[in-house]
Amino acid sequence: MNILVTGGCGLIGHNVVKRLESAGHNVSIVDTMTDYGIIPKDELDHLIHERMKGIKSTIHPICISSPLMNGIFEKFKPDTVMHLASFPRQKVVNANPQAGAKVMSEGLLNLLEMSTKHGVKKFIYISSSMVYGDFTDDVREDAVCKPQGQYGILKLAGEWLVKDYTRRTNGSLTHTIIRPSAVYGPLDVEDRVISKFMLAALRGNTLKVNGAGETLDFTYVDDAADGIVGATISDLTANKTYNITKSHSWTLLDAANLAVKIAGSGSVECRDRDPDFPSRGALNIDAARKDFGFNPLIDVDDGFRKYHNWFLTSTYWKNKLNLSDK
């Protein structure tokens, strides 16, 4: 397969690209390699350098809404487009709503136009569990979506755009929609919840928990990447939507306490929940298990320990945090 991957330099993206390359697929990456100002430049440079180690695919550092995308489609001739590129999460979109809409809507529209123009067969859209809004455990893909906040709204709008474009091709272009949740792991940015918890614990600082009883379906990045690749190469996923998560909810308080336990330092402070974020639980993954054998292997305890060990062996973080004695 010739697979064009947008956002292929990101946390999930680079893990997906490595798996696709190892399976013998031809991959081309489009990624602006920006962090939208959420982490220091030296950290971004470090992350990009480490993520790209071993990747052979060509990287095009352009915006997906650029007219230059037409030339990439003409030259590479993808039969599959995987759209991972996005603003990273709700907080960033809320702070930059117009820029968020441009990236998440205009960029997607350009990709869909290019895909229909150039005869792409399959479009993989990486959405988010944020489309559901408030939900409890065992939410299925056919649940009514009531997103709260611009990130979830734009992701759900993207799902409908993808469905509409594929509907109008009368079967020549199919789609697969993926809804991941709370993905974490090595080479993530420091501004996500598990990264914040782990770094605060390693520094011996206070882990600030916004809503002790709030739960998330934390998913280790290897499991998320395996699920996305499985859905991409399967013949049974056309025009379907899948939850790709660990399918187990953890409270934020339990996650913070686990980080403190593993690091051997730090303390926990509970605060009021953030009203801008929906209350979430675990997602049901029966459809992914049935259609392409998705089987997430890394539970939160093992995942946190793997993530912690990565910090301890990362030259960048050892130097930045003075972790030589840890």
State each model region's role.
Residues 1-179:
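N-terminal Rossmann-like NAD(P)+-binding domain of SDR-like oxidoreductases, especially those catalyzing
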Residues 15, 71, 95, 188-192, ...:
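Generic recognition of short, well-ordered alpha-helical segments
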Residues 36, 90, 132, 184, ...:
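Flexible, glycine-rich phosphate/dinucleotide-binding loops
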Residues 67, 79, 91, 98, ...:
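Residues in well-ordered alpha-helical elements
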Residues 88, 143, 181-182, 211-213, ...:
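Short, histidine-centered active-site or binding-site loop motifs used for metal coordination
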Residues 93, 181-182, 241-244:
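Short-chain dehydrogenase/reductase
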Residues 137, 148-150, 160-216, 221-230, ...:
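NAD(P)-dependent short-chain dehydrogenase/reductase
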Residues 201, 205-326:
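C-terminal substrate-binding subdomain of Rossmann-fold SDR/epimerase-dehydratase oxidoreductases
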